[in-house]
Amino acid sequence: MCSLIQMAVVCCAATFVMLPSSAGEITEANWPQFRGVDATGVSLNTGLPDHWSVTENVEWKSDIAGRGWGSPVVWGDNVFVATVVNTGETEPIRKGLYFGGDRKDIPQSVHEWNLLCLDLASGQILWEKTVRTGVPTQSIHLKNSYASETPVTDGEHVYVCFGNIGLYCFDFKGEQSWSHELAAHKTRNGWGTAASPVLHGDVLYYVNDNDDHSTLLALNKRTGEKLWEVDRDEKSNWATPFIWTHPDRTEIVTAGTRAVRSYDLQGNLLWSLKGMSSITIATPYVADGLLYVSSGYVLDPTKALYAIKPGATGDLTLQDGQSSNDFIVWSSKKIAPYNPGTIVNDGRLFVLYDRGFVSCFNSKTGDPLFEAQPLNRGSEFTASPWSYDGKLFCINEDGMCSVMKAGDTLEILHTNSLAEDDVTLSTPAIAGDRLLIRTDKRVYCIRNASR
């Protein structure tokens, strides 16, 4: 799941989209999916912390057995985290971008695929459920995990996916409602999986792009019954789809190998766009009425980013020399990041690159405001950035977070660090006035001590 230059396709993909709808009320106190309610990574909440350390402003921290790069999700007093425990020996994580992370052989030790529920106020584990015990069905990249998909919740149930294993539904008391088995498929170079399911209405959608048989799957969220499944041409990818609701319709936007495809809620193709890189990780999202889609595999010459208007039909592919058309407002073939998703704040689109540089563009025109400015020194970046209170937060794989002003120039305000043994590939979650950071060993709840 990482790239040929290998990093983790993982957490960033690890990922979700669009407001899950249910009897539960979606508020800024909840963070029901990857990158939040609207998948933008932006919170309008106030009172959130911008300073922390391994002790400062740490309300609690809880050790999590096993390994998983999926983000925490939050609803009410519940924090949900997926993990897989290897009863044998797990190879140490190697941070950064590199060759040599392929692991062709499937581990033969027994693993446990688990979903945990933690108490938001204390970090206490309220319940832990094992959905499978056995030998893995696939190999994964050294930097991937068997729990890189982020759960999604509608306030009544939580849905978790373990790629090549299955989709599972639990109520908030930990009782399993249903399961749907996923067949094991080959993935690119044996890197594994990471794309997360998404919710809309009473339907759970899952993109299963692999090297055998790629599909878009729709399940009844209450029963797990398959409603429909459509074949896709794309091969292995790790991008979570996005449910885009606008005045014209609701559609399912999927970013994939060299192409973007959007479907209606019955799986019929609405439009497509060629011109992505060969590996896609970032989840699409909408800001200020435009859809932003990016893919920037580091070994490909094309690192495309598109800003797209709603209402498109047919083939949106740009002709040679074009950077826009009737529905593509602007685009660039050279500016997309690889693992991290982009983020829009107050008319500015920020791009965090894996090697620790940041660029900023006018989100409505694509005009550059600043480009390739360096952040803190240290390891690479896999987690997607997040934003609140006029600030942008970028955390690297060492757990060092650069806090910067979200402005027209790069202004780094300060940096925050976690424990020396923490490895941070997961994108954090925001709930109320709390920031939840997952590392390879634990979950931190960061909150201003005065609150």
Residue ranges and their predicted role:
Residues 1-4:
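N-terminal secretory signal peptides that target proteins for export/translocation
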Residues 21-451:
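Noncatalytic, solvent-exposed loop/strand surfaces
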Residues 6-18:
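Bacterial N-terminal signal peptides
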